[in-house]
Amino acid sequence: HPENSAEYKGLTVNNGVAQPSIVNPYLKRGRYRHRQMSAGDYVEGILKGDVTILGRAVTLVESTNPAHQAVAQEVIEKCLPHAGRSIRVGISGVPGAGKSTSIDVFGIHVLQEYGGKLAVLAIDPSSERSKGSILGDKTRMEKLAVHPDSFIRPSPSAGSLGGVARKTRETIILCEAAGFDKIFVETVGVGQSETACHSMVDFFLLIQLAGTGDELQGIKRGIMEMADGIVINKCDGNNVDKCQLAATQFRNCLLYTSDAADDLTRVD
């Protein structure tokens, strides 16, 4: 620098440090874009248990683009012979009942006790105004989210009724083909008539809270009579007595809504 010459004895300028680029170099080279995959590529990756390709396949299935739907249909048809070998559990309940937190604890217990691989399909409600969805159920599953043998896929309901997403059945097929032998389906927060999940799973678990209604609410036909098991959650602290009362009320309700005598053991 000329400022370092003799006539500028009181001023010294050092060479600066080059700043790194803030642009991703892969983006600059054009490598960031995903390669267009064929149906065969998807199927090959799914059968190998590649969760990245599995996630992309689920996105493809959920897409409303006609071109994507054509490829998705071919992928599902090729994965179908490899599906049907899992244990499917549906978890439903009112908003705030603790479905996601319960899945986190129960899922870790299942993986530790029985091994295998677990897929969790968490359905979040979509906004009627913006059509968007937060997809925040995964944030409640802190342990499962980092477990190497688990796969958590949040999906928007996209206006679908019944507590599940439009393509939940197809997503189950893909997960089974990828080698997941245990699948949990978490519905959106439901009311009394959202029972679509029941027909998709082997065991349908209903999570309830104490103080959400009396016996009259319980004997109303709907989701209560479809549940294979009922759990009264958040039974601790000052809530123990209320939960015990709620369990008694639900057992009494099952006398009117169920035919089997052993159904009284469904409430815990």
Please identify what each model-predicted range represents:
Residues H1-P81, E113, D241, A246:
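Non-catalytic terminal/linker segments enriched in charged/polar, low-complexity residues
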Residues D41-L47, G55-S86, I108-S193:
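Nucleotide-state-sensitive switch-loop elements of NTP-binding domains
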Residues Y256-D268:
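Single conserved hydrophobic/aromatic residue that forms the stacking wall/gate
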Residues S102:
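Hydrophobic positions on the alpha1 helix immediately C-terminal to the Walker A/P-loop
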Residues L205-I207, M226-D236, Q249, L255-S258:
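Conserved beta-strand/loop subsegment of P-loop NTPase cores
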Residues T195-A210, D228:
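Inter-motif core of Ras-like GTPase G domains
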Residues V89-I91:
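Hydrophobic anchor at the beta1->P-loop junction of P-loop NTPases
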